[in-house]
């Protein structure tokens, strides 16, 4: 039995958080698993009782002085937590947390695996890109989600492993499950610029009026653009239901016929994986830089240009008007399910942990 500590900023409703919780829940059956997080608050996703969660001490950030002082305090609190955990391996998630862990681990012998969950281009501030470039060579291993990211990081990181996110539904849904589908089209994700939900709304406005009337269009997620998007729905004269953050997305997948992803940049979008298990047809933007890792266009899903609402509307009309074609796409997509099974991904992680421990 090993002691494994995960480190992450929060356990909110993001895809990286979902992946961490799924992996922690799988590993805790055979190992002692803990999660160290920077911020207070409960996990959005259900954790097994065996997983121990601790939050670093919280500090003030209300003035410039406190912002600066608190960052130093947070760093030393992280280092203390790492030392006291007496872990066999550390696994950190997301870029800024990775950088902090590399610095906080200096002098400690415990190996550190860092995990990237966005495309390398997503980190925009130059200072953070610089810190990533100079710090990442000091990790013991780096896991990435896309083939293009693996090529990029191998230029300066000694051990880079392509590890897909596990789908927590893989233990719940059998391969031959069938679902009672409704005329439902989904958008699931944060309501921010990168997820580009306005593209979804504009595409709906371009659909044939009969399709607009006969289908229900739903956005599950919340974020800074919600009010702006609600105004946009009114100005376009369309009907869209805003559900906010949804804990039980399974119920939506079971009913939905189509899922749309409109992002500019992604790592390995959770929604494109989860939808495989529920016979939901996937239409995705050709986001930078890994859409083709998950979708073979016109075979197991459909790809459209980034921010091209006209193309999205045409692809939507294609599958909404041709149920046989939609079913062909989802049946082909189901062949990918085995790639994301929890048991398979867990074993891949254990192999990587063994590598860094024995290095």
UniProtKB/Swiss-Prot annotation:
One of its GO terms (molecular function) is hexosyltransferase activity. Its main location: membrane. Changing residue 17 to A: Complete loss of catalytic activity. The keyword Glycosyltransferase applies. Changing residue 71 to A: 6-fold decrease in the turnover rate. Slightly accumulates the tetra-LLO intermediate (Und-PP-BacGalNAc3). 1000-fold decrease in the turnover rate. It holds the Pfam family Glyco_transf_4. Processive glycosyltransferase that is part of the biosynthetic pathway of the lipid-linked oligosaccharide (LLO) that serves as the glycan donor in bacterial protein N-glycosylation. Catalyzes the transfer of exactly three alpha-(1->4)-N-acetylgalactosamine (GalNAc) units to the growing LLO precursor, GalNAc-alpha-(1->4)-GalNAc-alpha-(1->3)-diNAcBac-PP-undecaprenyl. Cannot accept UDP-GlcNAc as substrate. This is GalNAc-alpha-(1->4)-GalNAc-alpha-(1->3)-diNAcBac-PP-undecaprenol alpha-1,4-N-acetyl-D-galactosaminyltransferase. It comes from Campylobacter jejuni subsp. jejuni serotype O:2 (strain ATCC 700819 / NCTC 11168).
């Amino acid at each position: 039995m090993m002691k494994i500590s995960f480190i992450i900023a929060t356990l909110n409703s993001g895809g990286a958080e979902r992946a961490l919780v799924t992996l922690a829940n799988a590993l805790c059956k055979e190992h002692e698993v803990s999660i160290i997080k920077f911020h207070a608050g409960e996990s959005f996703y259900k954790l097994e009782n065996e997983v121990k969660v601790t939050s670093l001490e919280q500090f003030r950030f209300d003035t410039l002085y406190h912002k600066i002082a608190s960052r130093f305090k947070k760093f030393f609190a992280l280092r203390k937590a790492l030392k006291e955990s007496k872990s066999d391996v550390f696994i950190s998630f997301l870029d800024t947390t990775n950088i902090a862990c590399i610095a906080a681990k200096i002098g400690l012998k415990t190996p550190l695996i860092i995990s990237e969950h966005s495309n390398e281009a997503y980190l925009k501030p130059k200072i953070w890109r610089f810190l990533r470039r100079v710090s990442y060579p000091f990790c013991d291993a780096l896991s990435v989600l896309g083939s293009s990211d693996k090529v990029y990081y191998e230029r300066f990181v000694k051990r880079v492993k392509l590890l897909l996110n596990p789908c927590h539904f893989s233990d719940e849904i059998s391969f031959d499950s069938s679902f009672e589908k409704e005329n439902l089209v989904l958008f699931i994700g944060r309501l921010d610029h990168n997820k580009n939900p306005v593209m979804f709304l504009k595409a709906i406005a371009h659909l044939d009026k009969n399709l607009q009337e006969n289908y229900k269009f739903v956005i599950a997620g919340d974020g800074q653009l919600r009010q702006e998007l609600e105004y946009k729905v009114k100005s376009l004269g369309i009907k869209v239901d805003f559900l906010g953050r949804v804990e039980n997305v399974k119920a939506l997948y079971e009913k939905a016929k189509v899922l749309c992803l409109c992002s500019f940049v992604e790592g390995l979008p959770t929604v494109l994986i989860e939808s495989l298990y529920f016979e939901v047809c996937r239409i995705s933007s050709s986001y930078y830089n890994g859409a083709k890792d998950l979708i073979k266009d016109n075979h197991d899903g459909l790809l459209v240009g980034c921010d091209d609402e006209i193309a999205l509307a045409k692809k939507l009309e294609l599958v909404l008007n041709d149920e046989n074609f939609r079913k062909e796409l989802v049946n082909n997509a189901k062949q990918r399910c085995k790639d994301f099974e929890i048991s398979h991904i867990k074993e891949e992680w254990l192999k990587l942990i063994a590598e860094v421990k024995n290095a």
